[in-house]
Amino acid sequence: MPFVPHSPEDVSVMLDAIGVNTIEDLFADIPAEMRPKSFALPKGLSEMDVCSRLEALSARNRTDVVSFLGAGFYDHHIPKAVDALSSRGEFYTAYTPYQPEAAQGTLQAIFEFQTAVCRLLDMDCANASVYDGGSALFEAMMMAVRATRRRKLVIDEALSPIYRTMLASYTSNLQLELVTVPHRDGLSDMDALKASVDDTCAAVVVQNPNFFGAITDFTDLFTHARAHKALGVISVYPVMQSVLKTPGEMGADIAVADGQSIGQPLSFGGPYLGIMTCTKPLVRQIPGRIVGRTQDVDGRTGYVLTLQAREQHIRRAKATSNICSNQALCALRSLIHLTLLGPEGLVRTAELSMERARYAAERLTALPGVELLHDAPFGNEFAVRLPVSAFEVVDRLTARGYVPGFPVGRYYPGMDNVLLVACTEKHSFEQVGILAEMLGGIL
């Protein structure tokens, strides 16, 4: 039967086939008092009226603001070629390539993505992606639980509070012990983290740069964790990885990231991209798709889904994860973006972003009562302590067309006067100067 609106005759045939008299009989298991009496749907509109309605709604959005928001999601420039190439029909509509002989192009693209992120993070293995940075971090934690057969996880409070909320939600019924180690003025408390990692710990979970923008070397912490047979799990910012010490250099066992900053536009929370990488001993624990490269009997290169004993291929209880899909299109966009930039271009993107952040920090801290939250090095994002409420500053400047940053007090009690400011290569020095002048005018 074609997928078109069914005629009364079609409906009658289908109802007869399944042995019911009316469509309402299909919902007999739902009590009558719980069924909607009416959906109160408005009268249908013509195509022209629908367009007018949507245009009127979209006109309410403010597109003329200059935003210094970050907090894990960044407005980097995306070359137009990313949209042009990723919107090709063979990529845009393709699903999981179960038949490798018919999907070599898709499989090769995923393989190249895996290779690119492994090189970027200096790790051994990667999967084809998961949903976003938060789900990637949860899956990393579960990898550690399976690999170590332990249930205690030590989490740095300087880890993104968005991720920490997701972890608490995802693990609420898993009988895991989540130990959160408080930060110190936006910095990781290394002594407290080490003290919390013992022989019952599955993993220590950190972020670099952390939520407050601080850059940290976790090499000693991961060495300490390894001495207790625990794993080191780190969440990173892909663009900054081009200029920072990599997870591999620090000795991390699992490294994850949200790939939004490479090829994905800011879009009300998604779709984004969860990047997952690990060391070779953990490759059988990593969830999702993995594409491998091999040779056929004639010596020709071929790409296939490999190590498939993970989700729908085996019993649910034996699977590494319930994630049966991935963000292959977003992964492709990230691959195209990385390829267009090249190593030098990615480094330049990071350097330009850091350059503007340094200038912004200098201008803002020159204002009376404004000081950096910490003295640790930072990349393209930093936190400042204001003499007034950060919420008030955000409200007043946003009304004038400049979003000055993120009010940290939204997630951290007692930090209502702390503002998190992020810069990318898209910000001009002039815009930074205007921000400083506007902030100075209300302090």
Curated annotation (Swiss-Prot):
Catalysed reaction equations from the record: N(6)-[(R)-lipoyl]-L-lysyl-[glycine-cleavage complex H protein] + glycine + H(+) = N(6)-[(R)-S(8)-aminomethyldihydrolipoyl]-L-lysyl-[glycine-cleavage complex H protein] + CO2
EC main group: oxidoreductase
Keyword Oxidoreductase assigned: yes
Organism field: Nitratidesulfovibrio vulgaris (strain ATCC 29579 / DSM 644 / CCUG 34227 / NCIMB 8303 / VKM B-1760 / Hildenborough)
Gene: gcvPA
Function: The glycine cleavage system catalyzes the degradation of glycine. The P protein binds the alpha-amino group of glycine through its pyridoxal phosphate cofactor; CO(2) is released and the remaining methylamine moiety is then transferred to the lipoamide cofactor of the H protein.
InterPro entries: GcvPA, GDC-P_N, GDC_P, PyrdxlP-dep_Trfase, PyrdxlP-dep_Trfase_major, PyrdxlP-dep_Trfase_small
UniProt protein name: Probable glycine dehydrogenase (decarboxylating) subunit 1
Assembly, per entry: The glycine cleavage system is composed of four proteins: P, T, L and H. In this organism, the P 'protein' is a heterodimer of two subunits.
Pfam families: GDC-P
Family indicated by similarity: Belongs to the GcvP family. N-terminal subunit subfamily.
Signal sequence segment: none
GO MF annotation: an example: glycine dehydrogenase (decarboxylating) activity
Keyword Oxidoreductase: yes
Keyword terms: Oxidoreductase
EC numbers: 1.4.4.2
Phylogenetic classification of the source organism: Bacteria, Pseudomonadati, Thermodesulfobacteriota, Desulfovibrionia, Desulfovibrionales
GO biological process: glycine decarboxylation via glycine cleavage system; nucleoside metabolic process
